[in-house]
């Protein structure tokens, strides 16, 4: 019996190592992110890839049809996962690959919480400013937080920037309680 965490790490690191050696890490990571989205929307697809009742040639044909626009290394990786009967772990493997890749590429993901939706231009402005501050490429997604009272809150890993009235009120409350 194998340890699932080891399996996920070994497969993801193998793909990372290949992409890094080939000099295609950034491009492959972008393709992997797209594939993860497709697989998350179509969980039944992984069941087919992992099924012993479906012929391997049929699985390979389905993989070619579904992912033909992606990097050939990624397509072959998915085929290998289907052949080795680890396709049921493909999402976890690919997510782990993205984590390893982002660490190497110095990419950080975060969330910008606001009271209203921000347009793409504003989000890009915040990404640019925070990227300079953290010395990393930052990618933000906007989420509405009704508990904020005006202002914004940005969270990237352990890094938090809060510039909102509710943030100031919480700080004031903490300082009053301490006294």
Swiss-Prot record:
Major location category of this protein: membrane
**GO annotation, cellular component aspect:** plasma membrane; proton-transporting ATP synthase complex
Topology relative to the membrane, per the entry? Peripheral membrane protein
- What does the UniProt entry say about where the protein is found? Cell membrane
The molecular function terms of the Gene Ontology recorded here are: proton-transporting ATP synthase activity, rotational mechanism
Q: Which UniProt keywords apply?
A: ATP synthesis, Cell membrane, CF(1), Hydrogen ion transport, Ion transport, Membrane, Transport
InterPro entries, from UniProt? Answer: ATP_synth_OSCP/delta_N_sf, ATPase_OSCP/dsu
Gene3D superfamilies under this entry? N-terminal domain of the delta subunit of the F1F0-ATP synthase
Classification via PANTHER family: ATP SYNTHASE DELTA CHAIN (PTHR11910)
Q: What does this protein do?
A: F(1)F(0) ATP synthase produces ATP from ADP in the presence of a proton or sodium gradient. F-type ATPases consist of two structural domains, F(1) containing the extramembraneous catalytic core and F(0) containing the membrane proton channel, linked together by a central stalk and a peripheral stalk. During catalysis, ATP synthesis in the catalytic domain of F(1) is coupled via a rotary mechanism of the central stalk subunits to proton translocation. This protein is part of the stalk that links CF(0) to CF(1). It either transmits conformational changes from CF(0) to CF(1) or is implicated in proton conduction.
UniProt record similarity statement: Belongs to the ATPase delta chain family.
The subunit structure is: F-type ATPases have 2 components, F(1) - the catalytic core - and F(0) - the membrane proton channel. F(1) has five subunits: alpha(3), beta(3), gamma(1), delta(1), epsilon(1). F(0) has three main subunits: a(1), b(2) and c(10-14). The alpha and beta chains form an alternating ring which encloses part of the gamma chain. F(1) is attached to F(0) by a central stalk formed by the gamma and epsilon chains, while a peripheral stalk is formed by the delta and b chains.
Q: Which HAMAP family match?
A: ATP_synth_delta_bact
Protein name as it appears in the record:
ATP synthase subunit delta
Question: Which species is the source of this protein?
Answer: Metamycoplasma arthritidis (strain 158L3-1)
Provide the organism lineage as a comma list. Answer: Bacteria, Bacillati, Mycoplasmatota, Mycoplasmoidales, Metamycoplasmataceae
* Name of the gene encoding the protein in the UniProt record: atpH
